[in-house]
Amino acid sequence: VDASPGANDLPGRLVFSTTADEGNSPSERARINKDGYFKSSNAADYVSVDQAQHEFNNNHASNNSLTVRATHSSFAGTGFTVGIKRSSSQLYDIVAFYSGNGTNAYSDTEYRFRGDGSAFADGDWNTGGADYAENFEWSDGNSSNEDRRGISVVLVGDKIREAAEGEDPIGVISGNPSVVGDSDGTRWAGKYLRDDYGTYLSEDYEATDDEGNTVTQKRRVLNPDFDPSLEHVEREFRPEWSPVGLMGKLRIRKGQVTGARWIKMRDVSATVEEWLVR
């Protein structure tokens, strides 16, 4: 602990240092200045820390305000996590991003990730894919985990199979979709009950706020068939599911059945063509 004055943080500061084993030369790791601002040893600027609201203030034109870095070469965790105790709701945002007007840094909302899983943007969503796809289940289950990208498919009830000559396919198994609908990337799709139109059912529950008051809030109704002990495997990694590109630019195996309105764009290789599916 160093209480001696330092540049720009008079009359004193709190410095946290460590030494190597049996060493005598301490190395600074972090410091807090007289105003309660904090910085780590390798940071260029202080950040303000408040019990109710944590802020990282950067008054430089080009420096990053916040950087999250994972340095382990085998990192397999989550780089940035936000957890909110309240049940899923439209009444709060998990993350929001703002732009300013020269004086107010929160003048306009540019991105919102709402507490019910909905996302909003004032501009574009840019992706490397070129088609819109939805997940469908194979009628044969694809138990051999066959690579079926580029195959045209038709519906069999609510499932799919390869299209036969003379049939009108609904789309093509996509290898690089821009958007994938009917995904279950966050949890088992049936974890919460829905009505006939696919909207979540909700129920009242009581919670206690920070002041000790009991408040009534709403949450989704848990499916009694949900088993939290079972590992959730996303449809992306299950062989019985595939993303069917329903519109956009798609790669199709040569010789596959095509729709009457589809337009061939080019040959990608000796075995693959690119078509505009519409």
Question: Can you name each region flagged by the protein language model?
Answer:
Residues V1-T127, S143, V156-D158, A164-E167, ...:
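Trimeric beta-solenoid/beta-helix "fiber body" segments of extracellular/virion adhesins
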Residues G36-Y37, F97-N101, T109-R278:
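Extracellular receptor-binding modules and their adjoining Ser/Thr/Gly/Asp/Asn-rich linkers
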